[in-house]
């Protein structure tokens, strides 16, 4: 049975690629959705007067920030996304990476309560699939001091590799990695790293390329697609030229 991991940015499902999910699920694929929610977290922190800062694209997470992150990720964003998928007819079940725990992490030095995934436990997801549900996973992991904030792209890549997924789909707000306003059709992990280190890929694209490269090195092809385009997800899974595909060198022959 085909396994697909889909990473989405936040809670909106209307009018975009996630509207393809009912067909994917009814076609027999085992789908796991991993979500972010950085914008929602920033808005909530601002409203509470909690300062925030970033280092190399990762949010520095102190105890107060983690408390709010759990509230936003495992609470509002996770449940809104699950409800949106339920409205489409997808039997979604919202969980956190700390449940099970699905994601075990080690602390990232200098970033407080930010974790790097070191182990994935798939039993909870297997149980949900066995019951006919689609897991929706919030980007939190369990570490030596309890819960940790985890970059959602990295979490999705680690989950895809652990599950032996057929593909990792990273949804964003552009049509892939763009060069001269056109998506680069295919990259190797080494090429991803060069785009990131050279600064050509910056902002939110850099962590997606790093995550895609990590998945590809683990044997899972990854594709960066526009989550705002209806049909993009189905087209990617059908083998169409959609977005930017990242695979190991030698896999493009």
From Swiss-Prot:
It comes from the Bacteria. This is Acetylglutamate kinase. The lineage of its organism: Bacteria, Bacillati, Actinomycetota, Rubrobacteria, Rubrobacterales. It catalyses: N-acetyl-L-glutamate + ATP = N-acetyl-L-glutamyl 5-phosphate + ADP. Keywords: Amino-acid biosynthesis, Arginine biosynthesis, ATP-binding, Cytoplasm, Kinase, Nucleotide-binding, Transferase. GO terms for molecular function: acetylglutamate kinase activity; ATP binding. It is an enzyme of class 2 (transferase). Substrate binds at residues 37-38, 59, 149. The record marks 7, 208 as: Transition state stabilizer. It is found in: Cytoplasm. Catalyzes the ATP-dependent phosphorylation of N-acetyl-L-glutamate. The keyword Cytoplasm applies. Its EC number is 2.7.2.8. One of its GO terms (biological process) is arginine biosynthetic process via ornithine. Its main location: cytoplasm. It comes from Rubrobacter xylanophilus (strain DSM 9941 / JCM 11954 / NBRC 16129 / PRD-1).
């Amino acid at each position: 049975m085909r396994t697909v991991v889909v990473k989405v940015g936040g809670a909106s499902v209307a009018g975009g690629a996630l509207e393809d999910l009912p067909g994917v699920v009814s076609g027999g694929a085992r789908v796991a959705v991993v979500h972010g929610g950085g914008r929602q977290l920033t808005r909530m922190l601002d409203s509470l007067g909690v300062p925030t800062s970033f280092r190399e694209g990762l949010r520095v997470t102190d105890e107060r920030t983690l408390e709010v992150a759990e509230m936003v990720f495992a609470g509002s964003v996770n449940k809104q996304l699950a409800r949106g998928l339920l409205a489409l007819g997808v039997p979604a079940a919202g969980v956190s990476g700390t449940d099970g725990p699905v994601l075990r992490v080690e602390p990232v030095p200098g970033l407080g309560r930010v974790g790097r995934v070191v182990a994935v436990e798939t039993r909870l997801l297997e149980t949900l699939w066995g019951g006919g549900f689609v897991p929706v996973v919030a980007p939190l992991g369990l570490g030596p001091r309890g819960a940790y904030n985890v970059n959602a792209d990295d979490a999705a890549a680690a989950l895809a590799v652990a599950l032996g997924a057929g593909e990792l789909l990273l949804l964003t707000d552009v049509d892939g990695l763009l060069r001269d306003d056109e998506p680069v059709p295919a990259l190797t992990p080494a090429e991803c790293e060069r785009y990131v280190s050279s600064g050509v890929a910056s902002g939110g694209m850099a962590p997606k390329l790093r995550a895609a490269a990590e998945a590809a090195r683990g044997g899972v092809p990854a594709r960066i697609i526009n989550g705002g385009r209806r049909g993009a997800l189905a087209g990617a899974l059908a083998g169409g030229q959609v977005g930017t595909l990242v695979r190991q060198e030698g896999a493009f022959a």
